[in-house]
């Protein structure tokens, strides 16, 4: 079938959880289906990133759209104006009339069998009017977004920020409920998320697919050795749950660890670290902040303990599966391991207070047989159960079933149409490339 895949960014560099999940899923789906990847484009990606897109799609359509940069005057002005909007800011900033028009044009041309909206944000550009979108639709939910905002609100101590986060949480809850009910099918990435959407939003056609990991890519190379007391955290540092996690770890957990192991070090790997974290690394030589790296594996290999101190989040944590495949000893909060079929004390250690988390990290750093046993069991689990091929096959079946159900409800011809491959470039309009 011909799938129109909606996104808010190109996938290269494949450097954060949502990109990793989509990239691996699409690479597998592309072998069985025709993929048109329609995305917003902030102009940062170059020719190489666009060329790389054909690893996961047959046609690339880029719609120019640049959200405000964080911490600028324009950014704060948008936050202020958003107080009067029914949409949460995380959705509002991706509204694009041009993307909406491109969706309508392609669907009405009869060249699309099924549309997949990847994350909640692109849904703001899916037309609401009856007849504008006459193909089956699937919403791919990597998280329950409202739950993330609820947890932000719950851990925030600043009164002004807490009020703002409360409003964003309630807006997101309303919007997410509406969107989940609008689509023909919703796909979650864990059974917990599926159940929450069923129970909280009253969504009937919601399914779940497991999280996968590329076990050929993520495996120990033997070229790097763990530093005895090195603790590693990886993740995009411009994602709010990761920002909160590393602040929590450096302020409340790391000092407790260093009381027992004074030479313990922390390596934070991930793009766009905030100024406060960079300033900490300048003042404290035991903290290393790398920023974006081309290959996270060598940093993971050097970890004697891999930590996931998340207090906020939803969906599942790809970073845990990657660390498991790398045979790392992992310490996580319950929220950090949420949605993953793994057991405390078997594949990792769970701890939900600063004191217990610090104690668990100290155990791993001091007890090498324990660390090795956790890493060995973790790697065996992901290699046996969580390859991307199996995950993509399940997602593909959900799409096929959604299309088949739609065909029984309509007499419209939704068979795949033959297309003429073409390439055009227009500075003010979408850039279309096909292979």
Segments from the language model and where they lie:
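Acidic donor-binding loop of glycosyltransferase active sites
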Residues: 184, 286, 292, 301-315, ...
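N-terminal subdomain of nucleotide-sugar transferases
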Residues: 1-63, 108-110, 421-435
